[in-house]
Amino acid sequence: MVRSDENSLGLIGSMSLQGGGVVGKIKTTATTGPTRRALSTINKNITEAPSYPYAVNKRSVSERDGICNKPPVHRPVTRKFAAQLADHKPHIRDEETKKPDSVSSEEPETIIIDVDESDKEGGDSNEPMFVQHTEAMLEEIEQMEKEIEMEDADKEEEPVIDIDACDKNNPLAAVEYIHDMHTFYKNFEKLSCVPPNYMDNQQDLNERMRGILIDWLIEVHYKFELMEETLYLTINVIDRFLAVHQIVRKKLQLVGVTALLLACKYEEVSVPVVDDLILISDKAYSRREVLDMEKLMANTLQFNFSLPTPYVFMKRFLKAAQSDKKLEILSFFMIELCLVEYEMLEYLPSKLAASAIYTAQCTLKGFEEWSKTCEFHTGYNEKQLLACARKMVAFHHKAGTGKLTGVHRKYNTSKFCHAARTEPAGFLI
């Protein structure tokens, strides 16, 4: 059997595979017979084959040196073996020039993983269970943080509603200057406030007596069917007068009746007659005493009855809260509970009104709610109202107990939708 000249060792040098790399050297002879195929054809078939890839071996330097010291494997390059190398897209590294093939830089590198090395590492590529649990927990935390950020973004993007848009054609709403009016109220509301400890200057009175008087006046106001503004102005006149004038205990009810008369003259269209006020006082005072006290109180207050009370803020803030009838009634129930309590004098009228609406919203909905529109128009955020709201919830809890139950009985009627029976928002405390 004739052996092909192209497989002669005189034509093709040894091929060595070191570290997965293929290194070939082609040697031509000077003498070539006329019957033999041109060596250029064979060399062309070998040298023009696709470039061999570099074999990346994941071994340390010492291990690579050990492999390089192994004797090379000699194998003749047949056409079949050359075709296999061509299918694997090999890369030729020229040992003579020591320069990489320019085409090889565009080919993706092939990574060869040593089986022996995998066996040394244990042969198990699965990660420990605690690592998987940690990654799951981290993913869950990241998901929760994304949800919180989305919720915060939704809150930040919540638009402020134009609450006066529906009243632009209503001349009584005074849309053109309603904002200026309430800005004025906010700037001057401190003038309507009294020191929260003014009762210390009264030698014959205490805060419990004040509470009894106001609780009784709330019932009188309800029986006479007077306007809501009248009640708030009456209590404001009483506190401002007692803060600057000493009074004896037996004249306290006279101060209350006279303050109601002054408020009615300022707010009401039809004013109760003096005799009716004397009658509800069980005729404890004469007509002359009522008129004399009226002069004294008006002069002491310098006839100043145009100060903002919680009522003017309540109407505006309820509009900002887009309230319904139920929320409105419950809000007034909350703030009237505060009128009886002496300790609530420390809060500004606007803050009392905002806290009452906030507490009523939480009571009805069962969770904390304070919209951007409410925050914009009231000037108070949820955190600023929380302390006052907690006190209102405490008053709500005890509204039906004790001796001062006038507000509870008033709002436990069908006229006020039995608002006093509403379950208090205990989660705020």
From Swiss-Prot:
Top-level taxonomy: Eukaryota, Viridiplantae, Streptophyta, Embryophyta, Tracheophyta
SMART domains reported in the protein's UniProt record: CYCLIN, Cyclin_C
UniProt-annotated stretches for the region Disordered: 86-109
Family according to the record: Belongs to the cyclin family. Cyclin AB subfamily.
Coiled coil: none
Name of this chain's protein: Cyclin-B2-3
UniProt keyword annotations, A-Z: Cell cycle, Cell division, Cyclin
InterPro entries tied to this protein: Cyclin, Cyclin-like_dom, Cyclin-like_sf, Cyclin_A/B-like, Cyclin_C-dom, Cyclin_N, Cyclins_cyclin-box
Domain of life: Eukaryota
Gene3D superfamilies noted in UniProt: Cyclin-like
GO-annotated molecular function: cyclin-dependent protein serine/threonine kinase regulator activity
GO biological-process terms attached to the record: cell division; mitotic cell cycle phase transition
Compositionally biased region (Basic and acidic residues): 86-101
A Pfam family assignment: Cyclin_N
